[in-house]
Amino acid sequence: MWEKVDQLTPSRYSPYRFFSAEEWAGFRADTPLTLTYDEVKRLRSLGDPIDLDEVRRIYLSLSRLLSAHVEASQLLFEQRKQFLNMEESFKTPFIIGIAGSVAVGKSTTARILKELLARWPSSPKVDLVTTDGFLYPNAVLREQNMMERKGFPESYDVGAVLRFLSAIKAGMSQVRAPLYSHLSYDVLPGEYQIVDKPDILIFEGINVLQVRDLPEDGKMVPFVSDFFDFSIYIDAESQLIHKWYIDRFMRLRETAFVNPESFFHRYSQLSEDAARSIGEGLWNNINLKNLKDNILPTRPRADLILRKGSDHLIEEVALRKI
């Protein structure tokens, strides 16, 4: 199943170590389970079957790994301060990037991790920001004929993303992240999430690991992932993601889309067959193309790949070698 990850190199030369879910679960050690059944149910996205068993099996080991990375990062920061004779006392937040296709479960992973990390014995301050708010407003996308490219790299204000992450890394206070409404399917004008000197920031979005073409003149061009201390890619076969996307679309048709204020309210008025046809078109013409052209190629850049099976649960893990 991992051939596509390692298609360019023989497995023994892979930059990753591969583990089954059962092997990965063994790395939990004595990491405590600090979430309840009801909390997991509240945190998971529509159609995501994650439960306490999955948290025990996958996320407790991941929490332990991230704890080790955060501790090592803090030690390195202190050593570098001494090396450079720095007197500044500001803290540099540890930033975790989470990438993957639409409907693959990024948001659930991000929310579960946020809660687990915030409950470490050290009680770190953990914030979660998604890239949705950094999309250009619909008015701008319409003006530039890009509504059907929404979610593609060019539909994001990358400059705003870079300024936000740079401010976070610089230890600035009261940094604003624009908010997005899935009801109106648009950025909320004048509304922001305030991120105030977190110990850990989780930054989640489909294209956060993407890079741009390098300039020929050697000028410094920052990438979003340059600000990450650790990155995670949520992976699955495209046909599975397709099924999850359509299943979610049809559920939303009977729930969120029923709201007259929903951008997609018109789909709730269609027959089941007509709505399914719309969903298939959105998948094939937009989301599948974005996955193949822009999202999947970033998978080898992740520090950790969580591979899901047909039941939407993680069955394999790839961890980059140090």
UniProtKB/Swiss-Prot annotation:
Residues given in the record as ATP binding sites: G100, S101, V102, A103, V104, G105, K106, S107
Enzyme class label: transferase
SUPFAM superfamilies membership: P-loop containing nucleoside triphosphate hydrolases
Top-level taxonomic group: Bacteria
Listed pathway(s): Cofactor biosynthesis; coenzyme A biosynthesis; CoA from (R)-pantothenate: step 1/5
Compartment list: Cytoplasm
Reactions mediated catalytically: (R)-pantothenate + ATP = (R)-4'-phosphopantothenate + ADP + H(+)
GO terms assigned for molecular function: ATP binding; pantothenate kinase activity
Primary location recorded for the protein, binned into one broad class: cytoplasm
GO biological process terms on file: coenzyme A biosynthetic process
Keywords: ATP-binding, Coenzyme A biosynthesis, Cytoplasm, Kinase, Nucleotide-binding, Transferase
Gene3D superfamilies: P-loop containing nucleotide triphosphate hydrolases (3.40.50.300)
GO cellular component, one term: cytoplasm
EC numbers: 2.7.1.33
Record-stated family: Belongs to the prokaryotic pantothenate kinase family.
Annotated protein name in UniProt: Pantothenate kinase
Lineage of origin: Bacteria, Pseudomonadati, Pseudomonadota, Alphaproteobacteria, Hyphomicrobiales
Gene encoding the protein: coaA
